C-alpha cells in the first residue's frame, strides 16, 4: 500500500471518528461511480451528508482547504446526484460537506461546500 493511500485512509478514519462523535452514522465509505468517489456518506438526524475528506501533513502549498478544486467539486456534485438517483432518494435533505485535517490539528468540518 502506498504511503499517500495509507495517509488518506488514516485521514478518513479520523474524519469518520470525528463525525461519529458529532452524532453521525456511517452509511457508506469510499462509494464509487462513473463520476468519481465519495469518501464518506453519513446520516446526521434526517439529513444525508456526502463528505469529502482532505488530509495534509502541514500547510505547505496553501493548506488543505485549497485542495478541493472546481473540477473536483463538480465530480462530487455529479456523484451525489447519481447516488441519490440510484438509491431512489427523492425529497431527502442532503448536503455536500468536507472534513479538513491538517497535521495534528483537530478536524475542521466545513458544511455545504457548494455554497
From Swiss-Prot:
Gene3D superfamilies per the UniProt record, alphabetical: 3.40.1350.10
Coiled-coil stretches noted in the UniProt entry, renumbered to this chain: none
Disulphide-bonded residues: none
InterPro entries: Restrct_endonuc-II-like, tRNA_endonuc-like_dom_sf, UPF0102_YraN-like
Single GO MF annotation: nucleic acid binding
Protein family membership: Belongs to the UPF0102 family.
Protein's UniProt name: UPF0102 protein NMCC_2054
Lineage start: Bacteria, Pseudomonadati, Pseudomonadota, Betaproteobacteria, Neisseriales
Amino acid at each position: 500500500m502506498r504511503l499517500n493511500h495509507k495517509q488518506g485512509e488514516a485521514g478518513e478514519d479520523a474524519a469518520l471518528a470525528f463525525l461519529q462523535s458529532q452524532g453521525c452514522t456511517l452509511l457508506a465509505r469510499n462509494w464509487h461511480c462513473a463520476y468519481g468517489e465519495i469518501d464518506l456518506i453519513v446520516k446526521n438526524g434526517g439529513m444525508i451528508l456526502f463528505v469529502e475528506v482532505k488530509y495534509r501533513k502541514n500547510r505547505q502549498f496553501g493548506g488543505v482547504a485549497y485542495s478541493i478544486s472546481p473540477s473536483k467539486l463538480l465530480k462530487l456534485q455529479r456523484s451525489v446526484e447519481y447516488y441519490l438517483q440510484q438509491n431512489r432518494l427523492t425529497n431527502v435533505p442532503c448536503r455536500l460537506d468536507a472534513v479538513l485535517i491538517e497535521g495534528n490539528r483537530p478536524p475542521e468540518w466545513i458544511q455545504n461546500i457548494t455554497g
